[in-house]
C-alpha cells in the first residue's frame, strides 16, 4: 500500500527543472532537435534518460521514479563494494543505510530527478575502479579502462562540471602507472580511455550533425553555460566545483 502511495506521489513533480528535463526528453523522442527546436542548458544524456522514463510513465513521473531507484541502488551497491575493498572484509548491507540517508537528505535530492542524482552511479563506479586499481598488483585491463572512459563521456554529456572528478581519476591512475614503471601500459590505457570517451560522444555528434545542429549544441551546452548562465552552479566557477 505504501509503495502505491509513493507511485501516486510520483505522478507529478513541482520542481521546475525536472519538468523542463521531461519536456526536453519527450520532445527529443518526439522528433524535435535538442537546443535548436527546444532549449535548455543541461546535457543531452540527461534529456535522453528523461525521454526514456517518459516511455514508462507517459506524462507523469513514475518512469523517473524507476530511474531514480535504479540510480540509487547502483550507487549504494557500488559504494558498499568500495568500502569492502578499503576495509579488506565483507560488510553488512545495513552499512548502505548511512550513505542512503545522507544522500537523500542532501540538497540535490530536495525535489528528485536532478542531474547530480543520476550521476551518482557513474561517479561511484569510477571511485570503485580506482580503489580497485590501487589495491591490485597488476595493471587494469584495457576493457575496464575503456568502460570508465565511456562512463566519463556519459557524465560529460550529462553535466560537464563533474569532469574535475574524472580528471583527478586520470591523474591518480597515471601517477600509479608511472610509479610502477608501466609506461607501455599507460600509453595503451590512455588510448583505451579516450576510445571510451569517443564512444560516448560519437552518437551525439551523429545526432546533431545529421540535423545540422552541431553549432546549437556547443553554443547552448558550453558557451551559454560558461559565459551567459548566471544561475547557481553556472559559469566558469562551476568548472572548479561540483554543485
Feature-to-residue mapping (PLM):
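Loop-to-helix entry region of an early transmembrane alpha helix in multi-pass inner-membrane enzymes
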Residues: 44, 48, 57-77
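Transmembrane-helix motifs of polytopic, lipid-linked glycan transferases
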Residues: 66-89, 125, 129
Amino acid at each position: 500500500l505504501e509503495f502505491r502511495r509513493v507511485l501516486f506521489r510520483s505522478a507529478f513533480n513541482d520542481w521546475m527543472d525536472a519538468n523542463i528535463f521531461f519536456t526536453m526528453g519527450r520532445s527529443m523522442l518526439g522528433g524535435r532537435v535538442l537546443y535548436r527546436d527546444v532549449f535548455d542548458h543541461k546535457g543531452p544524456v540527461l534529456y535522453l534518460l528523461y525521454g526514456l522514463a517518459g516511455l514508462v510513465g507517459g506524462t507523469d513521473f513514475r518512469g523517473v521514479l524507476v530511474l531514480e531507484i535504479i540510480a540509487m541502488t547502483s550507487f549504494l551497491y557500488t559504494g558498499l563494494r568500495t568500502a569492502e575493498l578499503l576495509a579488506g572484509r565483507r560488510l553488512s548491507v545495513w552499512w548502505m543505510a548511512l550513505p542512503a540517508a545522507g544522500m537523500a537528505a542532501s540538497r540535490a535530492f530536495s525535489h528528485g530527478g536532478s542531474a547530480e542524482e543520476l550521476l551518482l552511479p557513474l561517479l561511484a563506479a569510477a571511485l570503485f575502479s580506482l580503489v580497485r586499481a590501487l589495491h591490485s598488483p597488476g595493471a587494469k585491463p584495457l576493457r575496464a579502462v575503456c568502460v570508465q572512459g565511456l562512463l566519463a563521456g556519459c557524465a560529460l554529456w550529462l553535466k560537464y562540471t563533474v569532469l574535475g572528478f574524472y580528471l583527478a581519476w586520470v591523474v591518480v591512475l597515471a601517477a600509479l602507472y608511472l610509479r610502477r614503471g608501466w609506461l607501455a601500459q599507460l600509453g595503451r590505457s590512455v588510448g583505451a580511455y579516450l576510445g571510451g570517451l569517443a564512444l560516448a560522444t560519437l552518437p551525439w555528434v551523429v545526432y546533431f550533425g545529421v540535423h545540422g545542429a552541431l553549432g546549437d549544441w556547443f553554443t547552448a551546452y558550453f558557451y551559454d553555460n560558461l559565459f551567459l548562465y548566471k544561475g547557481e552552479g553556472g559559469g566558469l566557477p562551476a568548472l572548479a566545483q561540483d554543485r
